[in-house]
Amino acid sequence: MRLKVEFTTEPFDLDEAPAHAVVAREVIQAAELDAVDVGPFGNTAEGGADAVLTAVDALLRKSLAAGATRVSLQVNVIGEGS
């Protein structure tokens, strides 16, 4: 099964990326995911279910530890491939 994750971390800082946002970006970019798109107001990535779920676990743990007060995410099934 293939999944797509969309997420944001808060609090926002329009002047520079806060530590929790940098950590979240590093987690997603280091994961074995496809179609990673990192932006200032939202991020998306796609991949196999195991890879996405592992990345989401790390994303939540590490961004909260780095100061995020809120993490909003959505996970969608986008296909049956690996």
Predicted regions mapped to residue ranges:
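Charge-rich, low-complexity N-terminal segments
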Residues: 1-82
